[in-house]
Regions:
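FAD-binding core of flavoproteins
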Residues: 103, 107-226, 230, 366-373
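N-terminal glycine-rich flavin-associated loop
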Residues: 41, 92-108
């Protein structure tokens, strides 16, 4: 869980001091608090409000916000253990979305409100549009993460960013959920007013919430993938059949190796994208279009690994893995849900294919080989 790429892009396996501090803090918190009982209560419709207060007390929602704006001042790479741990422990909170929303607000020079924040990309998953003056929203959007739990929504329209109070009468909400029973609601906006408006400076990242949301999901997917690998290896070593652990069987070893390999590739792809995001938000040299490419690669790798891992881990566990009594479903239901959110692996593979066609064979190859990983 500690392999990193440093800010210079060198895979030295040594986390920064801030990354280590954040990782230790969030690991201790989730290991103690995200219990089977909490997850079962969440599935039964009870929000994890006490856990949310704990993450607030630890300063996690503002991890990506500059210290001058009241946050921790962490880079995307330094804050990545939070996203990873959300997935590893399957923490049922709008924490990843709040981190992203707060980061965008701070980047645009806007005040970050207290409380959970959801994020919306105008023009995606519906017909929601921001008016020319940037003061009102009209339209409908589906699959909004955690809308019922959030008072605030950050809506991006290319480089314009607005903060919206979801409790106003001009906004309607229809409840929905994903496979993991996480809130994925439908919102209707009828000339809804915006609380504040700002301007992003993320040139070439034309859909910032869509792209960075995909990066966030890729990171949480990697965390869940590593949890699934750990569960599969542990079960294969403990389950004895015909006098020896089933993990000794060659076919199972091959399955586990495939799953671990795909997980490792997804983790490295997300680390590269996190490095690019850190460069962009901290104003270091780098191409924003390179970040878009890196995010696409990360989401493709994470989505494909999720499909493979969910299948393999259930084969390893056999019938017991499909029971509600076993904890495996908390992880695999999130794999099935998150792989499609903010664009499926098929969507982002198409984006990569279009990039290759647009650049031509010589241009695309040069773009790959000239990049510093």
């Amino acid at each position: 869980m500690n392999t990193t790429i440093n800010h210079q892009g060198v895979d030295d396996g040594v986390p920064s001091e801030m990354q280590t501090m954040i990782a230790d803090s969030v690991e201790r918190l989730f290991a103690r608090q995200v219990t089977r009982e909490l997850l079962e209560r969440f599935d039964d419709g009870h929000r994890a409000d006490s856990l949310w207060q704990m993450v607030v007390d630890n300063g996690l929602p503002g991890a990506l916000v500059a210290e001058a704006a009241g946050g921790s001042g962490a880079s995307w790479l330094d804050a990545s253990p939070v996203l990873h741990s959300i997935g590893y422990w399957q923490a049922p909170l709008p924490l990843a979305e709040t981190m992203l929303g707060a980061a965008l607000l701070a980047h645009a020079g806007m005040e970050v409100p207290e409380g959970p924040i959801t994020v919306i990309q105008a023009g995606r998953l519906g017909d929601l549009q921001l008016d020319e003056g940037g003061t009102h929203l009209q339209g409908r959007v589906v699959n909004v993460p955690w809308a019922r739990s959030c008072r605030w929504a950050v809506v991006a329209d290319s480089q314009r960013l607005v903060l919206v109070d979801l409790r106003q009468a001009a906004i309607t909400l229809a409840a929905g959920s994903n496979f993991a029973d996480e809130e994925r609601d439908t919102l209707g906006f009828v000339n809804a007013s915006c609380q504040s408006t700002g301007q992003l400076k993320l040139a070439d990242l034309h859909e910032p919430v869509w792209h960075l949301g995909a990066l966030v999901r890729a990171c949480t997917l990697v965390g869940t993938l590593e949890a699934v690998v750990d569960k599969a290896v542990m079960y294969a070593n403990e389950r004895v059949q015909f006098g020896k652990p089933i993990g000794k069987q060659q076919v199972l070893q091959q399955y586990l190796a495939q799953m671990a390999g795909a997980t490792g590739a997804a983790r490295m792809a997300t680390q590269v994208a996190l490095r690019s995001a850190s460069d962009l938000f901290l104003g270091r040299a780098g191409s924003h279009s390179t970040l878009a490419f890196d995010i696409a690669v990360a989401k493709v790798c994470a989505g494909e690994a999720a499909t493979l891992a969910a299948s393999v881990v259930h084969q390893v566990h056999g019938a017991i893995g499909f029971t509600h009594e076993h904890t495996l479903h908390f992880a695999t239901r999130r794999l099935w849900s998150w792989r499609d959110e903010f664009g499926s692996d098929a969507h982002w593979a198409k984006v990569l294919g279009q990039s290759a066609i647009a650049a031509g064979s010589e241009g695309f190859w040069a773009g790959l080989t000239d990049r510093s990983l």
